[in-house]
Design a protein with these regions (language model features):
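Alpha-helical segment of the N-proximal tetratricopeptide repeat
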Residues: 19-27, 36-42, 46-59
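Short, solvent-exposed interaction modules
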Residues: 106-112, 117, 122
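Core register positions within helices of long alpha-helical scaffolds
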Residues: 24-27, 55, 87, 119, ...
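Amphipathic alpha-helical scaffolding segments comprising HEAT/armadillo-like alpha-solenoid repeats
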Residues: 1-9, 27-42, 61-74, 93-106, ...
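Acidic (E/D-rich), amphipathic helical modules within compact regulatory domains
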Residues: 46, 51-55, 63-70, 74-90
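Solenoidal tandem-repeat scaffolds enriched in leucines and small polar residues
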Residues: 143-145, 149
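Conserved hydrophobic register position within alpha-solenoid helical repeats
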Residues: 18-21, 52, 84, 116, ...
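Alpha-helix N-cap/helix-start positions at coil->helix boundaries
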Residues: 12-15, 46-47, 62, 77-79, ...
Length: 172
């Protein structure tokens, strides 16, 4: 056995049904079928929901904010919520600030709180400043650091009086 191989690697085999569904998702993506991906946000498998979040953000733009915000607030899986926060940040619409702020303030996963803080910084609105300052005392060092990264970006945007591609590349 290779030293990095898990003893129970048979438990991590991806079912053929998931691979088949990913192929169907690719077809639906090529057809720009937003409704299909909106429906997949409720799929039982987190792998599918994670992909659906990213694809819906790409296909629907600002119209996806309401769906991604719901995922951020309600999905049971932290990875899916993290991807929703990331996608909302990349989209950059101020309509996502409320749900991202709630995630920073109360999500049970530091992983999600961290990404939501970064996303607020990417969006670049001063409306997020209070939430980000509150995150400076979060129990998680990663969240505190992410809040500082986001606050630095807000300060840079206000100093330069512009938002551009550079200001969306905060890392995190």
């Amino acid at each position: 056995m290779h030293p990095r191989q898990l003893k129970n690697d048979h438990l991590f085999i991806i079912p053929k049904s998931i691979i088949k569904l990913l192929a169907e998702m690719e077809k639906q993506y090529e057809d720009n079928n937003r409704q299909y991906f909106e429906n997949l946000l409720n799929h039982q498998n987190y792998i599918i929901r994670t992909r659906a979040v990213c694809i819906l953000a790409d296909l629907a733009g600002e119209e996806s904010v309401k769906y991604l915000s719901k995922v951020l607030e309600k999905d049971a899986n932290a990875l899916v919520r993290h991807e929703a926060a990331f996608s909302l940040g990349q989209l950059g619409f101020s309509t996502a600030i409320s749900s991202l702020s709630r995630a920073v303030e109360s999500d049970q996963s530091f992983f999600v709180r961290h990404e939501a803080a970064i996303a607020l910084g990417v969006i670049g609105s001063s409306k997020a400043r209070t939430t980000l300052k509150g995150a400076l005392v979060d129990s998680s060092e990663e969240v505190r650091q992410s809040a500082l990264v986001a606050l630095a970006n807000l300060k840079y945007i206000s100093t330069m009086k512009r938002k551009n591609k550079f200001t969306t590349m905060t890392g995190g």
